[in-house]
Amino acid sequence: MTNIRKTHPLMKIINNAFIDLPTPSNISSWWNFGSLLGLCLIMQILTGLFLAMHYTPDTSTAFSSVAHICRDVNYGWFIRYLHANGASMFFICLYAHIGRGLYYGSYMFQETWNIGVLLLLTVMATAFVGYVLPWGQMSFWGATVITNLLSAIPYIGTTLVEWIWGGFSVDKATLTRFFAFHFILPFIITALVAVHLLFLHETGSNNPTGIPSNMDMIPFHPYYTIKDILGALLLILALLTLTLFTPDLLGDPNNYTPANPLSTPAHIKPEWYFLFAYAILRSIPNKLGGVLALLLSILILIFIPMLQTSKQRSMMFRPFSQLLFWTLIADLLTLTWIGGQPVEHPYIIVGQLASILYFLLILVLMPTVSLIENKLLKW
C-alpha cells in the first residue's frame, strides 16, 4: 500500500515541501533563516490576534487599551512584548536571510528573489503601520514624518498624503485604517511566502559553493527538520531572554508618553530596523532626493542579479568580493548607528559618506572587483 503522505492531495503538498524534498547535503546554518522567518510570522500572527482582541483603534482609547493589555489582561504584558520584540527578531532573521542570498548568489533564482524583495517591502509596511497603533509620541510623530515624505511627489504629493491620512493631519481616520492594514498585511505576507516557496522548489536550494548539487541531494526530513528545530529553539531562547529580561531595550521611551500633536519629540526616529534607510533619507538635504534615495536603498536589491559580473555564483572562493561584502555590512551597521543620532556635526558628514559608500559598493565596486577576479582566474 502506498504511503498516505504521497497520495493524499493535501499531504502530498506538505510531503513535497518539508519531508521528501531533495536538499543539498552541504547547506550551512545560514540556510536556517527561511524556516525561522516562517516561525516568526506564525508567532506574530498569533500574538497579534490575541492583542487585537483587547485593542481599540481609536485615538482617545488606543494608548489606554495598550496599558490595559499590559496591566489587566492575563499575561497581556507577555503577549505585547513578545509581539514587539518578535518584530525585532523577524527583521534580524530577514536581514540575515538577505545577506545570505547576497553572499552565496541565491539572487540568481530571479523569481524567488523578486518575490523576496516584495516580501521585504510588505513586512516593512506592516511593521511601520504596526508601530503607529500604540498611539504614543513616537507612534504619532513617526507616522506624521514618514507619511509626509509622499508630499515630495510632484503635483499629486499633498493630495496623496491627505488621502492616506483621511483628513488634514494624522488623526482618528489614520489610526483606524492603519489598524486595518496591520491586520490584513500578515495574511498577504503568508500568501506571498507560499509563492516564494513555490518558485524556490521549482529550482531547488542553492548551496555555499554555488555549484549545482543535483548529484548530491538528501531528503529534507530528518536531516534538515532536526537542524531547523535547533535553530527554532535558539530563536525562541533569544526572544524569551529579550522579552523577559529587557523588554524595552529596543523600544523608544517616548512611546510611553501618549501622542500629543502640540509637542514634538526632540529626536524623531523609527524602530532600529529602519534606521539604516532613515540615515540615507536624512543624508540628502533635498526632500525629493532623500525620498528617492530611501526608495532606492531597498529597491536596489531588485537590480542585484543584473549586476552579477562574476563567472562564479557564490563568494565562497572570492576573497576580494568577500572583503567588499563585509565592508557593506559594516557600512549598514554604521548607517544604523547614524540613523539613531541627532542631526549635527560629525554625524551629518559620517551619514553622507556612509550613504555614498553604500551605493558605491553595490553599483560600482562589487561588479568591478568581480571582473578583476575573473581576470585573475583567467576566466
Curated annotation (Swiss-Prot):
TM segment ranges: 33-53, 77-98, 113-133, 178-198, 226-246, 288-308, 320-340, 347-367
Keywords carried by this UniProt record: Electron transport, Heme, Iron, Membrane, Metal-binding, Mitochondrion, Mitochondrion inner membrane, Respiratory chain, Transmembrane, Transmembrane helix, Transport, Ubiquinone
Binding-site residues, a ubiquinone: H201
Keyword Metal-binding: yes
Cofactor-binding details, from the entry: Binds 2 heme b groups non-covalently.
Entry's Gene Ontology cellular component terms: mitochondrial inner membrane; respiratory chain complex III
Membrane topology: Multi-pass membrane protein
Subcellular location, record wording: Mitochondrion inner membrane
Highest taxon listed in the record's lineage: Eukaryota
UniProt key word Membrane: yes
Cofactor(s) in the UniProt record: heme b
Residues the record lists as binding heme b b562: H83, H182
Molecular-function GO terms, alphabetical: metal ion binding; ubiquinol-cytochrome-c reductase activity
GO biological process, one term: mitochondrial electron transport, ubiquinol to cytochrome c
Annotated residues for binding of heme b b566: H97, H196
Major location category of this protein: mitochondrion
Listed PROSITE patterns: CYTB_CTER, CYTB_NTER
Subunit structure: The cytochrome bc1 complex contains 11 subunits: 3 respiratory subunits (MT-CYB, CYC1 and UQCRFS1), 2 core proteins (UQCRC1 and UQCRC2) and 6 low-molecular weight proteins (UQCRH/QCR6, UQCRB/QCR7, UQCRQ/QCR8, UQCR10/QCR9, UQCR11/QCR10 and a cleavage product of UQCRFS1). This cytochrome bc1 complex then forms a dimer.
Remaining remarks: Heme 1 (or BL or b562) is low-potential and absorbs at about 562 nm, and heme 2 (or BH or b566) is high-potential and absorbs at about 566 nm.
Family, as annotated: Belongs to the cytochrome b family.
Function: Component of the ubiquinol-cytochrome c reductase complex (complex III or cytochrome b-c1 complex) that is part of the mitochondrial respiratory chain. The b-c1 complex mediates electron transfer from ubiquinol to cytochrome c. Contributes to the generation of a proton gradient across the mitochondrial membrane that is then used for ATP synthesis.
Protein name: Cytochrome b
Organism listed in the record: Peponocephala electra
Lineage: Eukaryota, Metazoa, Chordata, Craniata, Vertebrata
